[in-house]
Swiss-Prot record:
4'-phosphopantetheine is transferred from CoA to specific serines of apo-Pks13 by PptT. It comes from Mycobacterium tuberculosis (strain ATCC 25618 / H37Rv). The gene is pks13. This is Polyketide synthase Pks13. Gene3D superfamilies: 3.40.47.10, ACP-like, alpha/beta hydrolase, Malonyl-CoA ACP transacylase, ACP-binding, Malonyl-Coenzyme A Acyl Carrier Protein, domain 2. Pathway: Lipid metabolism; mycolic acid biosynthesis.
């Protein structure tokens, strides 16, 4: 893009005396000839670029014009004067005179809405080339004049460079640029993104997430504090290059790529992750995107759409496409890769990637929130140049216009601007045009000695395109922060096309002070999009008015009293509010004028002054400083604590004050896993942080792994908390507490005439019954208000006796005045009454260790005693005559119980209070109870819960009852616990109620309640409150920990603590691009003369979906082809090219895939495809459940198994595990019947021996599930070469039905094909009717398969099958394991009747039938099963329990099962597998079938003990079997944890561990608490699980007896209780449940140790519902399965599906394929090692 230059700026034509019309005619002729049009057809008013004139034409035209006229022009004239009309005038008449002197009268003041407020920049983040990854790094680079431009990094664009022609183009292109070092890295765990999704997310989205976090952290705004707030997100982005990778092969493109590569999601993903509720917009205006985004953010703040804005831009150079395009255009990219803005040698720009983000607030809001304001945006504007001189050509008129608009918006004269951060692309066209526009607006009218300074950050970081404006803003903000303008580099001298002096511009080439022409530093920032969208932002330094609160405007003089006819008005403020926040109306003011309250008494002032003097004379001790550390995950919290401790030991950390460190930490994000270290100095802080990092307890350290889910209950205690000096220290040292003490003091003076403050300040005060109550009330109010000042609030309150008054206030039930009145009346009456007591009228109170039931029995011996307080489940406060109180105390002590007498003369809450009730009623007349605003657990109303918003309760009767009747404190606490509350905070000068709270919570089964005191006798009161609030914060309750620190006076008050560390891992899609098509599935295609088709495919990696390959190949030739059946013969080796051959036949084709390595070919896949758009429906047998056909578009019944992709069902292990070696497809000439082949297929799929299959029983009753049905369906289609079969035809039928179906299809292929074609237009109902007609009369009844029973088999009635779902308890549950399957089948075969379900009661058999069943079972189980065993078994499950012992015995030596023995002589490395929870290693048979046929496998069965104890037993046996190695250790579920533990044990002994495979051994996403409360919850879940699984009702579990038992004891206790209750669960299942429970607990409690080696985690998508039901914390999965923090080299292989599916087909095929490659590499390495020896 060229620019304009002129040797004679305003000189008219000299060589030819032409007129303007003549010049126009000449130009028309020239242009017409150049573009091939008749001159007369040329429109002089149309831009010449639209007529077809190119830049190259313009150069030639300029030379001809110079020859003709003598006027030297450059190409830029064509852009400044785009039409023939304009250009001719310019050539003949020259440029019009420009008045650079300016017009002093021009008004630049703001006009328009008052909302045009200034906007504060409070946070900044940068990610620029050259390792400018923080604002500090960026500033240092700018100040030093460094750049981040490099050659194309190794590996960049490697996906594209495999294509030779593309590689050649890249090699010859100008590819120097600004590249980020780690564009592929992303911390997916931190941002809670699964690996697969992270791989599919555009790096621009990842950058936006990280930059937002860093910007908020830089702003010291906790991201957590903005959740749900009106936070706007505006992000510029103009490319989505990553989509090229995501869809490079559309056949495997992941759905995550839809959102992952969408530009709109860049901003949306930020809003989603951070839970921002303001506008969320991605802006694309090309190179001005990020500055336009900032402008829109400013507007959103001004118009109220947002209260905080995150704005900026991102850019990533993922593909070479744009770079190649610009390079081939020419004159765009700089040959040396450096941008030379406004320089004489400017020759183009350099592409760069990166991003920057700003955090914006309204200035007033930033000042209110105590934010550090970095700079201020005074104004901004955007525009477009409209239909100018070409879509992508810059336009100086439009640029000048946007400048004017921006400075008008700011209300600033542009002549006072100090510095312009220019767009400055370094092109010979763009720079002169930009300079011209600046000269017209910013330079106009300036004195020559006050030029506008000019620079461009592009010279340092390159052109970040959509993020360019963010980079420019970052530079200006940093320059303002450091009060220095950094140099613009690569400047060789002024461009010859720019008159700097005339335009009053000056380039900065050295660090320069801000000139402050207008009295303060002022800058403008420009960005221009190549599509014509222009933006300019005006930025200034922070002024005193920005950070100093404005003086309040004086209140107007009160108006005179209104005339009667006038409406009443309020003097002063427009509105007034009462203490509840309600508007006070004029009438209310008139009716109830506020009485003037007394102030602080002179005596109190004297005492206060003396106390302050005493305090000042004391030795100053360091304050207790809270250091908050948190993270989403506990492991990250620990790592952050460790890093902070290390930093605090560094010189920088030691030089930073503890308060500055705590203040900085308080403004970090507050994650769910929190800790607070309370410290007086650095040493204490470091010790505490080390304890957090190690997960250990320590003094003044509070740490929890997750938040409490319910809010705190504020406990307002009663009598007993009083002591001398209570509240005094806090009053003297905390202004908030002091202010509220004085408020209550004024009200008490008004009520009683004496000062509470005097009592608090009097060190000799001995509190009486009256003064105790009033003073505790005052302290409670002040404590609560202090907590509320720091953001704390109760979820509910509970008062105890005198505490009811403060409770009523905090619940919103009474105003402070009325609450004070209540406590004053109560206490005064009690004080007066006690003073009059003597002799026989004296009553005492005592606490005794008796429960409510016990105290009633004891009271039979003490008739005059009464209950005052039900304090705890085993503690009661009683009152009565002294002799009876002394007697009950003696009795309790004699019984070994706790007993304590109170120092009182009266007994409140007893009949002794009766004389006071009348006076109390009179005293409290006029109080106004209101509806509570938070929950109340009322100890007056027997602990009942009062909901917020309910009817008012605090009337006079409430206070009478509260004084006279018993206090139900423990009832209220128990109700709170039962309502889910676990945190109890006592507001008192000394904790007196927490002990009773603890006793009650423990009795309720809550053994880890959070019991938090406020003040305590003989403890520093300020430190106590800091500790209280730290605990509230740690438990996740409302508490703004920032408020625990004084307001910062400047940056020096914040420590430069370590930032959040992202743990980035590579997330990248393995796309490949190739011109020969071989990397695009199915590969390069060749049609052969014999009608066959061949494809050659070069897969991008070893993980090839062979079914997808076949489908892709078939679709080339048969667009409607559907994969009918397939068989995988082998696993392709690494580096193999796949050759697919297709041979057509009527109705479809056969397809084979061979793996080719060099000239060697191996058949790996054999498949059959059919010509079908949807499945053909084969007829089912009459007498079977009708198979409902599902045509295209027809709805599928809910119970129909989902037919996902063929890819999952075609990777079938039938041929590799069960089918005889070398078996081919069925043929009628083979001599094998359809029934024989069908028996093999179904038996192998369902785990039955073919001879055990009862043919008359519906398959679903035999235990058929969706996966089995799909496997049978596909195998039948493949073996019998049939069109697709309906799944319901398999699922709902018995074997006779399926056999008849196959026979019919084999004999009537043409008819079936026609039926399929016809059904494409039919509904499901029509298909069903046609099917019935087709089969009418053609199929006979089913026949018995076995005559052993000696009776005829019954025929199904009315063609109906039994309901397979069996809703009744214990009814129609199908077989679940091998033992139950063989037992079920044997019973059905011998008796000729289906048992129905394993729990169904069996009919009585005769001895002959029982003997036949016993004989058959003995043969199958290879163990003695007797007829007595059969006759005494009530159901199949019970009989199967006896069979199971022998059936599973197998080849077991001790705890080692031989699954496949290795040959005696050598052989391959064996695979050692470990049992899953509650199961045996037989489950690994599907995996064995997926590994090479000569791979030995040994299973390690269950032993008792913890994970570590089991490994200690396994490791010696492993060494005995395998010596020094190499070892391959594999396990599913618990087996994975055992494999891992054995790997550690072997490595410690120096053994060679080559492979550790964890098959979905995924740890819980949250730490599982090991508490007594968790025991109760765990067994509740177990009961629900058992009832669901075994269809039984579990009796009530005696939790209280479980708490003292270990896991083994608990499970035995519970299972014994279940058995004794009459629930019939056989012993085998009981033992299975015992081992399952203990095994799962072993996983939960395992102490995972670090492993320095490679571990492969085969990870499913989720746990199955039963696992989550038993332990809900397994519902959450970390992206690394919870192993990342322990394993140095973790490989995660996603396998999909649920946990329970991971060990079976089809998912195990994926595991086997990957593991086979690993085993092959191990064998290759062994061979290599042997060769070297």
């Amino acid at each position: 893009m060229a620019d304009v230059a002129e040797s004679q700026e305003n000189a008219p034509a000299e060589r030819a005396e032409l007129t303007v019309p003549e010049m126009r005619q000449w130009l028309r002729n020239w242009v017409g000839k150049a573009v091939g049009k008749a001159p007369d057809s040329i429109d002089e008013s149309v831009p010449m670029v639209e007529l077809g004139l190119s830049s190259r034409d313009a150069v030639a035209m300029a030379a001809d014009i110079e020859d003709l006229t003598g006027v030297t022009l450059s190409v830029a004239v064509a852009f400044a004067h785009p039409t023939i009309e304009s250009l001719a005038t310019r050539i003949i008449e020259g440029e019009p005179e420009t008045d650079l002197a300016g017009d002093d009268a021009e008004d630049w003041s703001r006009t328009g809405p008052a909302e045009r407020v200034d906007i504060a920049i409070v946070g900044l983040s940068t990610r620029f080339p050259g390792e400018m990854n923080t604002p500090e790094q960026t500033w240092q680079a700018l100040l030093e004049g460094r750049d981040g431009i490099t050659d194309l990094p190794d590996g960049r664009w490697s996906e594209f460079l495999e294509e030779p022609r593309l590689a050649a183009r890249v090699a010859g292109a100008r590819t120097r640029g600004g590249y980020l070092k780690d564009i592929k890295g992303f911390d997916s765990e931190f941002f809670a993104v699964a690996k697969t999704e992270a791989d599919n997310i555009d790096p621009q989205q990842r950058m936006a997430l990280e930059l937002t976090w860093e910007a908020l952290e830089h702003a010291r705004i906790p991201a957590s504090s903005l959740r749900g707030q009106a936070v706007g997100v505006y992000i510029g982005s103009s490319t989505n290059d990553y989509s090229f990778l995501a869809v490079s092969d559309p056949t495997v493109a992941h759905p995550y790529a839809i959102t992952g590569t969408s530009s709109s999601i860049i901003a949306n993903r930020v809003s989603y992750f951070y839970d921002f509720h303001g506008p969320s917009v991605t802006i694309d205006t090309a190179c001005s995107s990020s500055l336009v985004a900032i402008h829109q953010g400013v507007q959103a703040l001004r118009n109220g759409e947002a209260d905080v804005v995150v704005a900026g831009g991102v850019n990533a150079l993922i593909t070479p496409m744009v770079t190649l395009g610009f390079d081939e255009i020419g004159a765009v990219l700089a040959p040396d890769g450096r941008i030379k803005s406004f320089s004489a040698d400017a020759d183009g720009y350099t592409r760069s990637e990166g991003g920057g983000m700003l955090v914006l607030k309204r200035v007033d809001d930033a000042r209110r929130d105590g934010d550090a304001i970095l700079a201020v945006i005074a104004g901004s504007a955007v525009n477009h140049d409209g239909r100018s001189n070409g879509l992508i050509a810059p336009n100086q008129d439009a640029q000048a216009d946007v400048l004017r608009r921006a400075y008008k918006d700011a209300g600033i004269d542009p002549r006072t601007v100090d510095y312009i951060e220019a767009h400055g692309t370094g092109t010979i066209l763009g720079d002169p045009i930009e300079a011209e526009a600046l000269g017209r607006v910013v330079g106009r009218g300036r004195p020559a000695d006050r030029p506008a300074l000019l620079g461009a950050v592009k010279t340092n970081v390159g052109h970040l395109e959509s993020a360019a404006g963010a980079a420019s803003m970052a530079k200006v903000v940093l320059a303002l922060q450091h009060d220095k303008l950094p140099p613009s580099i690569n400047f060789a001298g002024p461009s010859p096309y720019i008159d700097f002096d005339a335009m009053r511009l000056k380039m900065i080439t050295t660090p320069t002070d801000w000139p402050r022409y207008g009295g303060y530093a002022l800058a403008g920032v420009s960005s221009f999009g190549f599509g014509g969208a222009n933006a300019h932002v005006v930025v200034r330094e922070v002024l005193p008015r920005d950070v100093v609160e404005k003086e309040p405007e004086p209140e107007p003089e009160p108006k005179a009293a209104a005339e009667p006819a006038e409406a009443p008005t309020l003097a002063g403020h427009a509105l007034r509010f009462d203490e509840f926040g309600n508007i006070i109306t004029d009438s209310a003011v008139a009716e109830e004028p506020e009485p003037e309250l007394p102030g602080v008494t002179e005596e109190a002032l004297r005492l206060k002054e003396a106390a302050l003097e005493e305090l000042a004379a004391q030795e100053v001790t360091a304050p207790l400083v809270p250091l908050a550390v948190s993270a989403f995950l506990t492991s990250r919290k620990k790592a952050a604590a460790a890093e902070l401790a290390d930093w605090m030991q560094s010189p920088e950390g030691q030089a930073s004050s503890l308060e500055s460190i705590g203040r900085s930490l308080s403004r970090r994000n507050h994650g769910r896993s929190r800790a607070v270290v309370l410290a007086h100095d650095h040493d204490e802080a470091i010790k505490g942080l080390r304890a957090v990092a190690a997960g250990k307890q320590a003094p003044n350290v509070f740490s929890v792994d997750g938040p409490v889910t319910t809010g705190p209950v504020w406990v307002l205690a009663g009598f007993g908390a009083q002591h001398r000096k209570m509240g005094k220290s806090l009053y003297l040292r905390n202004e908030v507490f002091a202010a509220w003490i004085e408020k209550v003091d004024a009200l008490v003076q008004d009520e009683l005439g004496y000062s509470v403050l005097e009592l608090i300040l009097d060190d000799a005060q001995d509190y009486g019954i009256e003064t105790t109550q009033v003073t505790i009330f005052a302290i409670q109010i002040a404590l609560g208000e202090l907590l509320r000042h720091h953001g704390a609030k109760p979820a509910a309150v509970i008062g105890q006796s005198l505490g009811e008054a403060a409770s009523a206030y905090f619940a919103g039930g009474l105003s402070l005045r009325d609450a004070t009145r209540a406590i004053c009346s109560r206490s005064h009456l009690m004080g007066e009454g006690e003073a009059m007591l003597f002799g026989e009228y004296i009553r005492l109170m005592a606490l005794v260790e008796y429960s409510a039931d016990e105290i009633r029995e004891v009271f039979s011996d003490f008739p005059d005693l009464e209950v005052c307080v039900y304090a705890a489940p085993t503690q009661t406060v009683i009152g009565g005559p002294p002799e009876q109180v002394d007697a009950i105390l003696a009795r309790a002590e004699a019984e070994g119980k706790f007993a304590r007498k109170f120092a009182t003369k009266g007994a409140s809450h007893t009949s002794q209070m009766d004389p006071l009730l009348g006076e109390l009623t009179a005293e409290l007349q006029g109080i106004k109870p209101t509806s509570p605003t938070c929950g109340i657990f009322s100890t007056v109303h027997e602990g009942r819960y009062i909901k917020p918003g309910g009817e008012p309760i605090h009337d006079v009767e409430y206070w009478k009852k509260g004084l006279r009747h018993s206090v139900y404190f423990t009832h209220g606490i128990r109700n709170a616990v039962d309502s889910g509350h676990t945190t109890f905070l006592e507001l008192a000068p000394n904790p007196v109620a927490l002990m009773q709270v603890a006793l009650t919570t423990a009795d309720a089964g809550l053994h880890d309640a959070q019991l938090i005191p406020t003040l305590a006798r003989k403890q520093d009161e300020v430190s106590s409150m800091v500790s209280t609030m730290a605990q509230l914060y740690v438990y996740g309750h409302d508490l703004d920990i920032r408020t625990l620190f004084s307001r910062a006076s400047g940056p020096q008050d914040y420590a430069n603590i370590p930032p959040t560390r992202f743990k980035r891992k590579e997330h990248w899609l393995p796309a490949h691009f190739s011109g020969d098509g071989s990397t695009y599935m199915p590969g390069t295609h060749v049609a052969l003369p014999d009608g066959r088709h061949v494809w050659e495919y070069a897969p991008r990696d070893g993980n090839v979906d062979l079914a997808a390959l076949v489908r892709a190949a078939a679709a080339h030739v048969l667009p409607d082809a559907q994969l009918t059946a397939a068989e995988q013969r082998a696993v392709p080796g690494d580096g193999a090219r796949l050759v697919t051959t297709m041979t057509r036949h009527p109705g479809g084709a056969s397809v084979q895939v061979h793996a080719r390595i060099d000239e060697s070919f191996t058949l790996v896949y054999d498949a059959l495809v059919s010509r079908a758009g949807s499945e053909s429906v084969l007829p089912t047998a009459v007498g079977a459940a009708t198979a409902i056909a599902v045509a295209d578009g027809a709805p599928v019944a809910p119970e129909t198994p989902a037919e996902d992709a063929d890819a999952e069902t075609l990777s079938d292990s039938l041929t590799t595990r069960y089918m005889p070696s070398g078996m081919t497809r069925w043929s009628p000439d083979s001599g094998e019947t359809i029934a024989e082949r069908l028996g093999l297929i179904v038996g192998s799929a369902m785990g039955y021996e073919p001879e055990d299959l009862p043919w008359e029983v519906p398959l679903i009753e035999l235990g058929l599930d969706s996966l089995m049905a799909v496997r049978i369906k596909n195998r039948v289609e493949y073996d019998f070469d049939l069109p697709p079969i309906q799944l319901t035809a398999v699922r709902d039928a018995n074997l006779y039905n399926v056999e008849k179906l196959i026979e019919y299809a084999v004999e009537h292929r043409d008819e079936v094909q026609q039926l399929h074609e016809h059904q494409k237009t039919q509904t499901a109902e029509e298909i069903a009717r046609a099917q019935a007609e087709l089969l009418h009369g053609k199929v006979g009844k089913t026949e018995p398969v076995d005559s052993e029973a000696g009776v005829a088999l019954p025929s199904p009635q009315n063609g109906e099958q039994p309901n397979p779902t069996g809703p009744a308890l214990n009814v129609d549950v199908p077989p679940r394991d091998a033992a139950e399957r063989v037992t079920f089948a044997t019973w059905a075969i011998v008796t000729g009747k289906s048992p129905g379900g394993i729990f169904n009661e069996l009919p009585r058999l005769d001895d002959e039938a029982a003997a036949k069943i016993a004989q058959r079972l003995s043969e199958r189980a290879e163990g003695p099963i007797t007829a007595e065993d059969v006759l005494t078994s009530s159901n199949i499950e019970a009989l199967a329990d006896k069979v199971r012992t022998y059936l599973e015995a197998g080849q077991i030596d001790g705890f080692v099962r031989t699954l496949r023995a290795r040959p005696e002589a050598g052989g391959k490395v064996p695979v050692f597998v470990f049992h899953p929870a509650g199961g045996s290693t037989v489950v690994y048979e599907p995996l064995l079938g997926r590994l090479p046929a000569d791979t030995p496998m040994y299973g390690f069965e269950r032993v008792e003990g913890s994970i570590e104890e089991r490994a200690q037993q396994y490791v010696p046996k492993l060494i005995e079997m395998q010596g020094d190695g190499p070892y391959v250790l594999v396990g599913w579920s618990l087996g994975g944890v055992l494999a891992y533990a054995c790997a550690i044990g072997l490595r410690r002994l120096g053994k060679d561990v080559r492979f550790v495979g964890l098959i979905d051994a995924v740890r819980a996403g949250e730490e599982i608490p090991q508490t007594k409360e968790e025991i109760r919850k765990r067994w509740d879940r177990y009961a629900a699980f058992a009832e669901k699984t075994f269809n039984v009702t579990i009796p009530a579990i005696p939790y209280e007896q479980l708490e003292e038992l270990d896991d083994e004891g608990q499970v035995r206790f519970v299972l014994d209780a279940v058995s004794q209750s009459g629930v019939q669960i056989p012993a085998g299942i009981i033992e299975h449940q015992r081992t399952s429970y203990l095994d799962n607990r072993a996983i939960d409690t395992a102490q995972i140790q670090p492993y320095d080696g490679h571990v492969t985690l085969y990870m499913a998508d989720r746990y199955h519902d039963d696992a989550i039901m038993f332990e809900p914390r397994y519902a959450v999965r970390q992206p690394d399965g919870g192993w990342g923090e322990y394993v140095s080299d973790l490989e995660v292989v996603p396998i999909g599906g649920e946990h329970i599916q991971a060990i079976d087909e089809p998912i195990i095929a994926k595991v086997g394929e990957h593991m086979s490659r690993a085993l092959g590499q191990i064998e290759a390495d062994r061979t290599s090692e042997v060769g070297k020896q």
